[in-house]
Amino acid sequence: MKKNLAKATALLLTAGMLGGTGITAAASDVELNPGGTYPVVKDGTLEFDCFTMSMPNVEDLQTNDFTKYMEEKTGIKMNFLTGGRDDWSDKLNLMLQSNDYPDVILGVSPDLAKYGVKEGMIIPLDDYLTEENVPNYLKMMEPYGLDMTKEADGKIYSLADINVCYHCQYGRKMWVNKRYLDEMGIDVPTTTDEFYDACKKFLEYKPNGVAIGGAAQGWYSRMQDWLIDAFVLMPNTSYTTSQKDTIALNTDTNEIECVATDDRYKEAMKWIKSLYDLGAIYDGDFTQTGEQLKTLVNQADEPVLFFTAGTISDMIDATSNPDFYKDYECMAPIAGPDGTRIAFQTPNPGVNSGAFCITDKCENPEAALRWIDFFYSEIGDLCSQYGADEGTDWVLNPEGKVGLNGEPAKYEVLNLYSAETQNHDWQDIGIRVAPADYRLGQAVDPDVDVHSTAGLEKLLYDASAELYAPYAGTSNIKLFDEMKLTDEESTNISVIAVEVADIIESDSVAFMTGAKDIDSEWDSFKDSLDKAGLQDLIAVYQEAYARSSEGDETEATTEAAAETEAATEAAETTAETETETAA
C-alpha cells in the first residue's frame, strides 16, 4: 500500500451515495486533499462505520453538534455503532467473532494480539503513519515514541490515547459525606478501626442508610478494591489480559505473584466481611453498574455515607445539585492493621495503544487516519471535549489566567463539563489527547470554589496531590503497564485469564459476604486457581516481564552509548576549534 496516497478508491459497500453528488462511492474514485488540509475529501462525502463506547451524558452521537462539525470539516461521515460503559467489550467481541464488524474502532481497545496479529481483521498501520496522513499524531507522539504502540510482532495496529492526567493516576478514591460526619461528631477515618466505627455509628444515626456504596462496573467504582488497599495493594484490571487476574510483581522476591493468594488479601477479606456483617455494605455493591450506584447516591434521602469513584462528578452533578455536591469530600487511604497506608497509583503513564484501529473492512485507511488526526491537533481535544465553538466553548491563551501548575494558562474552558445529558460535545467519548502540559495548562481561578463545576479539576488535582500521592509506592507490590505478549502466549492464556479472574471474583464475593468461610475454604480457593491454570498464567507474565526488563536494559545501554558518542563528537569538535584558534 502506498504511503502518500492523494487519491484513493473508496468502495463503500454499505454507504449508498456520495453526499450531494448523486454518484455512488463504488463507482467513483474519491480524491483526497493534500495531507494536513481540510476537508479531507475533495468532493462529496465518505462514510465509515465506527464502533465506540457511548456515555449517558451524551444524548445521541449521530446528531451531536461535534459529530456534525467533524462531518463538515472533513467530508467524512461516521455511522456510529455503540456499546455502553458496561457492555461495550461484549458487543465488540461479538461483532468481531461474527465477521460483521465496522471499518474503524474508536476509543476502546480490542484484543490486538488476537484480532490484529493473529487474525488480521485489524490491519497494521505502519505504512500509513506518514506526515501526509497523520502529521499531528506524529508530532504528539515524539516525546513517547511509536515503539510503545508496537505489538509482539513488531507492528503497529492502533493509534495511542494520550491522557497524562495527574488525578487519573490516583483514580481509586473514596468520597465521604462530611456533613454526616459532622452531625455525628466524628472525624474522617484514618484507620480500618475508625472506618468500621464510622460505619457503625452511621447505621445507628441513619438505620436505612447505606454506609458504603460501590459498583461492579464504573470508573474506579469497586469499593472493595479501595478497602483491600488497607492490607495489600490491589491490582486493577490487567492492561495485558483485560481481566481482573490480580497479577503483579513482588519486589521483595522479584517474582510474579497473584495478589489474591497473598495472606494479606485473606485478612482483607475477613475485615470486609466484618463490615458486611455490620450491615455497612449494600448487596448491590457487588453487582450494580456505575449508573445504578449514581441513582442510589442521588436518592432524595441521601442514603450513602461513603462511595468510591474516580471523580465525584460521575456520581453527583454540581450544577443541578450544588448543595449535595458540597456535602462530599475526598478522603485519604486508611491505614491497615500494620499501620501502612497504601494508595493505588496506575503504572501507566497515560499513553495507551488501542485508541483507534482500522479493520480490513475499511477501503480507505488514509482517509480514516486523516479524520482521526484532527483529534491530535492543538484544538482537537478541546473541540471533542467541550464543543467546537472557539470563544463560546473555550479560548486559547487567556490573558492573565494561570493553569493548575501555576504557569500561564494555555486555554480556558467556558462550556464546563456536566454529568447531565447534552448533545453539544462528546465529553469523555472517543479518545483523549491531553499531554501533561495541556492538562495542567487549563485556566483555573486560584480562589475557585473547588466544590463547584468550575473547580472540579482543581478539586481532583488537590485531592490527588495531598491525600493520595504521599502514600503511593509504599507497597512491595508493583503493578504492570501493558506487557506485549506473543500471539502464542496470548492464545495460551486467553481462556486461563478469564477463568482465573472469574474464580477470584466469585470466591472473593463469597468470602466477603460469608457465603463461604475463608478459613476453611482458603486452601480450596488456591487449589481451584491452580487447576484453572494460574501457574501457567504466572509463567507467561514472568517471561514477558523478563523480555521487557531486557528491553529496558538494552534501551538504557543504547542511550548511554549515544550519549557517549555525542560527548566524544562534542569533545572532538571543541578540540578542532581550539586547534584552529591556536593556528
Feature locations, PLM:
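Helix-loop-helix "hinge/cap" segment bordering the ligand-binding cleft or interdomain interface
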Residues: 126, 153-226, 249-299, 356-393, ...
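Extracytoplasmic/periplasmic substrate-binding proteins
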Residues: 220-246, 273-441
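Conserved N-terminal structural module of periplasmic/extracytoplasmic solute-binding proteins
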Residues: 8-10, 23-194, 238-247, 251, ...
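Bacterial N-terminal signal peptides that target proteins for export
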Residues: 1-9
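Loop/turn elements at helix/coil->beta-strand transitions in domains of secreted/extracellular proteins
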Residues: 44-48, 74-79, 99-103, 120-123, ...
